[in-house]
Amino acid sequence: MPVKPAIIPGLRYKDAPRAIDFLCDAFGFERHAVYPDPNEPNIIMHAQLIDRGNLVMLGNGTDNEYKRKAGIKSVAEAGGATMGLYVTVNDVDAHAERARAAGADIFIEPMDQDYGGRGYSCRDPEGNVWSFGSYDPLAPA
């Protein structure tokens, strides 16, 4: 059976349980799968959060072979965000208010974009950059 084409971001958090709660409360993700360490339930080995068929994977930034070989760093370890995520939403202003109420650091308020649509940008509690907008880059031109 063919695999559905997808690019799935993987994020590392110092406090993954808190990040999962935040991403669900602030951005509307739902828990698809959460696998805590059987010996340390506050350590999330792997989690999958879903939003309208799109997936984000995350876990604690625990030391393991993959992290060492790939050089993966959290935002704090890197000294700042090294990438940002863009998520399409229908009601940008309502989404921003939900995110703000949950504690998101909104550094670009909702605004109309020159290239179309409306959007805003924020940081989650560990500094990952998220942008949300109504501009759909995959829509037919």
Which residues make up each language-model segment?
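Conserved beta-strand-loop-alpha-helix junction that forms the acyl-donor binding cleft
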Residues: 13-15
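C-terminal catalytic core of tyrosine-transesterase DNA break-rejoin enzymes
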Residues: 126
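Vicinal oxygen chelate
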Residues: 1-10, 20-123, 134-141
